[in-house]
Amino acid sequence: MKNILFIGLGLIGGSLASNLKYYQPNLTISAFDADKDQLEKALSIGIIDKKIEDYSEGVKNADIIIYATPVQQTELYLKELPNYQTQSHLIVTDTGSTKSNIQSYEKFLLNNDIHLVGGHPMAGSHKSGVLNSKKHLFENAYYILVYDDARNAESAKKLQTLLSTTSAKFITTSAQEHDYVTGVVSHIPHIIASSLVHLSETNSKNHTLVTQLAAGGFRDVTRIASSNADMWRDITFSNQENILHLLEMLQQQLDSISSHIRLNDTNEVHSFFSGAKKFRDQLPVKQQGALSIAYDLYVDIPDKSGMISKVTSILSLHNISISNLKILEIREDILGALQISFKTPEDRERGIKALSDFETYIL
């Protein structure tokens, strides 16, 4: 399997192409994109071997096709794919955030000797476009492969072998399970974050302190509300049934805690918070999950001149790079005055060791 065709060369498609081109130079990487400028940029930075201007010619020669396009667009491509001449045992995958709609074409494509294995690389960036592609974007991130028909098991293995150079952590599951679980850990949190921001905005009109005090931890908690609105509108409707069910469950929890507060039931309110803390504290902290995250370290430093410089100098001496640094003005429940964000959990662990003279901890 030498000929890999990418349909769509944004951040995700470009990063996958960049990885395959760098680590597997024997492959021929081709790409088709409605935005011709993206193709020219990809060719100029060397992450593809050739640009495809005729879609039918591209799919005709491909051994594997990777659709890095929005879910609705991918569905249109899959629906029409059997109308084109393709290689025997063609393997097709995508990079979308929901899978039930995509995998609904699985048996239809199998009947045409096309093997569909859905893909969901759980990594991304606030930046977009092929020029922001990074070959290491998927390191230590979960990469979920999805199929519902056992006849696609071998194709899933081949796809995982191809993508092994991404250093992602592969999980195989069904479309239904994927969409429900990502609804719990990703889609609902995005809705909650946006709701909190709307709540803050509404109250800021009569309470000017809201905007000022929301600059600290509140901004971190609601960071994902700054995600692309077009993308999240599409994700919401492509996972509509699961999201509505989960919102009903969430509403029941909110109604329950409201009732306990109204009745001054201190034991139940305590159980609400302690139960959440217990479960959260058991969650892994060294791996990337469904939500894109920064690997933060909190450092307790005295309010003295030169202390921040001292911390950054120590990290620099150990060749540890950081992605952000923030002085916390509002830090209830947070001991450290300095928040340092690292790009990887490994860098954070090295940072903890390098800063052994300071009190550090992870939330």
Swiss-Prot record:
GO terms for molecular function: NAD+ binding; prephenate dehydrogenase (NAD+) activity; prephenate dehydrogenase (NADP+) activity. PROSITE patterns: ACT, PDH_ADH. Its EC number is 1.3.1.12. Residues 296-363 form the ACT domain. Residues 2-291 form the Prephenate/arogenate dehydrogenase domain. It catalyses: prephenate + NAD(+) = 3-(4-hydroxyphenyl)pyruvate + CO2 + NADH. Keywords: Amino-acid biosynthesis, Aromatic amino acid biosynthesis, NAD, Oxidoreductase, Tyrosine biosynthesis. It is an enzyme of class 1 (oxidoreductase). NAD(+) binds at residues 3-33. Pfam families: PDH_C, PDH_N. Pathway: Amino-acid biosynthesis; L-tyrosine biosynthesis; (4-hydroxyphenyl)pyruvate from prephenate (NAD(+) route): step 1/1. One of its GO terms (biological process) is tyrosine biosynthetic process. NCBIfam families: PRK06545.1-4, PRK06545.1-5. Belongs to the prephenate/arogenate dehydrogenase family. This is Prephenate dehydrogenase. It comes from Staphylococcus haemolyticus (strain JCSC1435).
